[in-house]
Amino acid sequence: MVIKKGISRVVIGSLDPNPLVAGRGIRKLKENGIEVKIGVLEDKCKEMNKVFMKYITSQRPYVVLKSAMTIDGKIATVAGKSKWITGKEARLEGHKLRNELKGIMVGVNTIIADNPELTCRIDKGRNPIRIVVDSKLRIPLDAKVVNDQFKNKTIIATTEMAHKGKLKLLKDRGIDVIILEAKNNKVDLDRLMTSLAAR
């Protein structure tokens, strides 16, 4: 299209790391007499495309860690409560992340302790796919993430140690369950990342 339209100069921020592309487009532009400038605002372009670049170079999802802790470095109060240990502004930032990212992942203990919805509460926000890491399928059948109107956006990652009857009940509800080989009696997070990236 660029060649057919008679464009004489093309400015490229950063090269596409996709090995299937491998600079062929740039070569074709140059062969057709088009001036090509590469690397303009390269760092900003790479930052803007970091999610794609991570996936295309590693076949892994781009992961952002969001955590909260009390002033003494704990993730829960003395009573074991972890809900609302952050302020309103921090919670809003968390919901902005949920809106921007494709998925949110928690361990089953978070589901058992807090029964969170893991939805985006920003007006007109987009709900992420909810991923629960649960090696032995201990998720309560009354958990919000497997019962609410967004249950079709829930993935449970488990192992062959999962209770087969519970597995069937969850699948019958339309819950997406990934069964992975266990590593040290837990979900192998390395394999989980590979599986999630392939979706």
Question: How would you name each of these model-derived features?
Answer:
Residues 26, 42-49, 91-98:
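Hydrophobic, well-ordered secondary-structure segments
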Residues 40-68:
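Proteins enriched for Cys/Gly/acidic motifs involved in redox and nucleic-acid/cofactor modification
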Residues 21-22, 48-49, 189:
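Short Asp/Glu-rich motifs
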Residues 14, 49, 79:
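Short, flexible helix/strand-to-coil boundary loops that buttress conserved ligand/catalytic motifs
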Residues 1-45, 129, 155, 160:
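Zn2+-dependent cytidine deaminase-like catalytic core
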